[in-house]
UniProtKB/Swiss-Prot annotation:
Keywords: Cytoplasm, Exonuclease, Hydrolase, Nuclease. It is an enzyme of class 3 (hydrolase). It comes from Hahella chejuensis (strain KCTC 2396). The lineage of its organism: Bacteria, Pseudomonadati, Pseudomonadota, Gammaproteobacteria, Oceanospirillales. PANTHER family: OLIGORIBONUCLEASE, MITOCHONDRIAL (PTHR11046:SF0). The active site is at Y128. This is Oligoribonuclease. GO terms for cellular component: cytoplasm. The gene is orn. 3'-to-5' exoribonuclease specific for small oligoribonucleotides. The keyword Cytoplasm applies. SUPFAM superfamilies: Ribonuclease H-like. Belongs to the oligoribonuclease family.
Amino acid sequence: MSRRDNLIWIDLEMTGLDPDSDRIIEMAVVVTTSNLELVAEGPVIAVHQPDSVLALMDDWNRNTHGASGLTGRVKGSTIGEADAEKQILDFLAQHVDAGCSPMCGNSIGQDRRFLARYMKDLEKFFHYRNLDVSTLKELARRWRPEVAAGIKKKGSHQALEDIRESVEELRYYREHFLRLTD
C-alpha cells in the first residue's frame, strides 16, 4: 500500500477545552495503513508548560492529569511546543506524504483547533478532512445501541493509549456496525 494512503492518528491532552486560554500538555501520533494495521508509533511527548498555565486547570483536568502522572511529566519536560511539533513532523515525514491523511482520532475537531492555534505547520501537514471515530459512536448509539454497548473504553486520558483505543474502536465498528471485513 502507498504511503499516500496511510492514516495519521493523533491525540492531544490539554489543560482544558478552550484553545484561546488552554494549552497542549501531551501529544502522540500513530500511523496505520488504510486497513488499520500498525505502521509505526511515533513519539509520545509531554509538552512543557509553566506552572502559571498548569495552575489555571479546572478540577477535572488537575485531578485527571495529576493522577495519571502527566502533570509531573509536563513540569519535568524540557520540550516546548515548537520542539514537540518538529519531532512529530519529522516522524510523520518518514511514513506519510504531507496533505494526504485526514486527521484521525476521537472528537478530533478539538485537537485540530489546538493544532491550528499552537502548531500550525503540523495542522497543515494533514488533509483538511477528518476521520472522527466519534461520528460512528454517535450513529451506533442512535441506530444500533446494541453495537454501541459492545465498546468498553478505559478512558485513560493518556495520548498514546487513547489513540490505540480509537484504532481498536474503529476496527470494532468496521466489523459490527459497517460490517466490513479485511
